[in-house]
Structures are given as structure tokens and as C-alpha cells.
Amino acid sequence: LKGYGSVSEVQFFRGGALRINLNELRDFNFNIFYSDNYYDASSNILSGDVQSFYTDGYHRTTTEIQRKNSVKERLIGGRISYEKGSYRFGATYWQSKFSKNVARDSSLILHKFSGDRANLAGADYDIITKNMNFFGEFALSQTSALASVNGVLLTFLEIADVIFSYRNYPADFTPLH
């Protein structure tokens, strides 16, 4: 587990995480995590649905102050990973619930997300053999869209590295985090 290390001041998780290592299963790691966080958002006056999320962090005007911390997200998830020598495999799942319904025409339209719940399941791998490193990740969102990033790193005589990467993100894949 690592602490938050991004430059974004608003899209972090606020909560806790626990890593469990059992002696009998020392090649496996089990992680659970939980987050409660508030986001700045504007809501439709009639329906109360979230119309837009704001990540600028400004709270200067009356409107900006009204948006401050107006939507809560509760997220819970887990991860299991297996690591043995130069092989690593993992699976992750998280589920998120917002305190308000997010309207389809909100700022998350890019991700085709609406409603008050989101989830994502993923699997990843990292395999190192001699001068090659195969790595990748697959993720399935609540829209049942499957996205992936896969690649191989080739090292030539320790003087040059070449990376080939393939990325596939369908239009209906909804990566909220």
C-alpha cells in the first residue's frame, strides 16, 4: 500500500486500507479499502440530480460555495494478488455509491455514466523472462464494457529498451477512478 501521491487535490480517496498476508499463503496479498469523500458539484434545482462536477478547488463566490462538498461518494473494494519470482497476477474490484443521482447529461457524459452506483472489476499481470517484460491490465465497468492495456518491454544488450503497447478503451467503458 502507498499513500496518495498525485498532483490532483480533489480526486483522491479519503479513508483507509488494510493489507493482509497469511503465513500459509505467503505468495498472496489481500487488500481491502474504503473511502468516504465529498466533491464539489452543481445539482438540478427540480430533480436534485448532479449536473456537473468541479475540480478547480475554488470556493470564492456564492455559487462556488454552494457547490462545495455537495456530493458524497462512498467507495469500498478489495484486491488479491499473487507474486512468485518474476510472475505477478492480480484482481481488483470496487463499488461506489454517490449521495445523489448523477444525471446522464452531467460532466461525466464523456464516460456515459449516470445513476448513483458505479463499479469496476479488473485483472492484471506482470511477467518477466530474461530480457522481456510482459504486462497488462483488463477492466470491466458497470456497462459491461471491457477495456485493456497490454504491452511488452524488450531490453537489448542493456543499452536500449523498446516498449510495444496496445490500448483498447471502448466508448462505453466508464472509468470513474
Feature-to-residue mapping (PLM):
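Signature for the C-terminal beta-barrel architecture of outer-membrane proteins
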Residues: K2-H177
